[in-house]
Amino acid sequence: MNSRTADRFWKCYSELPGTIKKHAKEAYKQFREDPYYPSLHFKQVHSTRPIFSVRITKDYRAVGIIQGEDIIWFWIGKHSEYDKILKQLRRT
């Protein structure tokens, strides 16, 4: 699976604390090696659309959509915001 990013992802990423950016880079490296590595908690978060999340830390997540052989990451941030995004996505 190829990993790509949307512009929105980088906007969110730029607002993260430095330590979280470091964890995000580490998670990305692990994802490239094995998307289903247990600590990543890579899972589908929408019942009908191919939207997935990955764990960055206990308190941060990234969200992307699978299109063909690619996952396009479009959001990264705090778990509290992640819950709000999932709620919005599940309404669609």
Where would I find each of the regions flagged by the language model?
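Basic side chains
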Residues: 21-23, 32, 43, 55, ...
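Arg/Lys-rich, positively charged N-terminal/basic patches that mediate binding to nucleic acids
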Residues: 1-27
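Tryptophan-centered motif/residue detector
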Residues: 10, 28-31, 73-75
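Short, charge- and proline-biased low-complexity linear segments
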Residues: 22-30, 84, 91-92
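A short, surface-exposed loop/turn module that caps and links secondary-structure elements
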Residues: 29-54
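Enriched for short, Lys/Arg-rich terminal
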Residues: 4, 56-92
